[in-house]
Design a protein with these regions (language model features):
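Conserved alpha/beta cores of soluble small-molecule-handling proteins
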Residues: 1-104
Length: 104
């Protein structure tokens, strides 16, 4: 990722959503995108559609990432993970990480 310096780095002005992924599917994706849209509007970061963030983009990112990484446990099941979408005035970033939280 080529990071552009903006107010996020100087003042923490940005928004993010971390979305649980189970069996390769993002949980409550539409709700997360609505919440990110609300935050972007409030912080004047631009509309998600204008920034290239929508349901299809997230699903394509997940599909591509999972095809490039072996994210299965020893028994062959998909490990729990999370996709994080970060949005600042000049940057959009998608990243993946383990999800240590259990349904319990």
């Amino acid at each position: 990722m080529n990071v552009k310096m903006d107010d996020c780095f100087q003042f923490g002005l940005g928004a993010f959503e971390t979305i649980s992924v189970a069996d390769g599917r993002p949980i409550f994706l539409d709700r997360h995108l609505r919440r990110l849209e609300d935050a972007a509007r409030f912080l004047d970061l631009g509309m998600l559609a204008e920034r290239g963030i929508d349901r299809i983009t997230v699903l394509e990112y997940l599909r591509k990432w999972m095809s490039e990484h072996d994210y299965r446990d020893r028994s062959g099941h998909m490990r729990r993970c999370a996709v994080k979408i970060m949005l600042t005035q000049k940057n959009v970033d998608f990243s993946m990480r383990d999800n240590p939280y259990t349904p319990d």
